[in-house]
């Protein structure tokens, strides 16, 4: 048995020595009270316990040897500042935990953070010299299980549990943190964090609450494997510094980029670094704003939720963010979100049921370590996505796969694609359903993200969207009758569906996103892996911050029906926002458009029917229509359908029609 494997430095020695290290003494000279006068400096040599501490304005309290210093009052981590402190007052010097982040503009300076944490674990055990144990509760480590963690923090930039190596189970931790974090791209100030290849952290029955800007609840980083089970996690927005300027520079960004149509300043969780896995099982994860299950600065990652609740409790935010060829997979989970279920830029999302076969596959592929009784205890249920606005939004290339008995219930459009290539697969053979509140299943538009403005090397969120006024110009080298690798391709299989599909791409270059030539701030991405349970993907944009750069936006919408019945309009269109000029105050108007169907310019629409029926409910403008021998295209009862190709009336029969293809519906 390994019991409390800690020491004052390294290697581990007896538990008695560790406890002596943590206990400290009555002051450095035996006093129970200490006053630090203005202009003076008190250098703390060892863990020191007082009954009262007074720090005058202009005084300084530091740890010896350049180490970090943590103040606790009655076991609560407290910001070290001028003031009067009374009770069980402890000052704990700890060895520095230096974390560097290559944020800022390309070629910019590296950020260096000095993490402080209540509990620091590595492959050798609990490291007392890096742990502010006075803030940790009654910690016990036995046979790889860490129990007794109770962290209360009212200071800024304080981490709860930091695991950098080894295989640990964190049993029933309770963490409450109030105050802002420092950098959620690095995990600075997170309640729970795993980092490093070879690190596996199982968090079991955790209760975590944070209240502060970028005071993230959970961080998985740098190739670690994080598994969260039966836990309750929630974050709440904080108060931003008075001098903060909203921006999207990684490492400096402290609030959501409004150009995505969201607000808030604390992501509940963040997955970072290459080859990192994070899995949430039978857990509740909530954020007041911004996002719940986020990914950033990474590639080739897996973010999985099984039988979990994913919630935005405030007025704005998303359920999950897919970037850098990530695979974001949701099985038996329920979304209750304000703006988007998932946002995609370079990642892939899968929605399905928590079937026994799926669970066993995930257990192997993600190294979850679930026993047969644990697997059997997970109830099979569908994934249900409730969003007050959109289901999935793209502002970068990626794919979505919807299967089993998944239900999308959205106030607005099910799938909103902004100037990106997208692959959307909907398999209704097991009962999947899509309910769009505005009647639009797929909407393709140019990217209306106005992008930042660079001020003194910082990408400030001062961009403004302006509705184009000129008519789109036809691009001679773009074929609107053929499928391209960059198109939006929707495949409907075995589903009965009512709703419309619009392609309102204008063509040319999409405005917004990162400045030209910059892209994102990470290494180039490669194709995403094919598992677990999701499609592979082609090379995505470079990972990094949650943006994409300008790129050619001419693209077709391809809709394939296989063994399906669709009632609705499929058409090229022109789109118009509710306001011609959209700034930060109108952030929720981004992506909200009305459509006027019309002949395609750079926005081809190709429809393929295989053993399917399309009931055309309104005039539809296509560039290609392929009707299989066992397929049907018809008007609703009491209406007549007329087909013209390049202005010529044609009988509608099995075959392929290309050019300006118009299906006109009239009464009678």
Question: Residues of each region from the PLM?
Answer:
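Short, T/G/N/S-enriched strand-turn elements that build extracellular solenoid repeat scaffolds
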Residues: 31-36, 42-45, 49-55, 72-75, ...
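Exposed loop/turn and edge beta-strand positions of beta-sandwich/beta-sheet ligand-binding modules
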Residues: 30, 186, 197, 274, ...
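Extracellular beta-helix/beta-solenoid repeat scaffolds
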Residues: 46-101, 150-210, 214-230, 235, ...
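Extracellular beta-strand/beta-solenoid scaffold signature
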Residues: 112, 117-135, 155-162, 183-194, ...
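All-beta strand scaffolds that present successive hydrophobic residues in beta-strands
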Residues: 36-37, 42, 50, 55, ...
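Gram-negative bacterial Sec-dependent N-terminal signal peptides
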Residues: 1-27
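Short terminal (N- or C-terminal) low-complexity/amphipathic segments
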Residues: 3, 520, 525-530
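N-terminal domain-start segments of secreted/luminal proteins
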Residues: 27-51, 98-152, 156, 180, ...
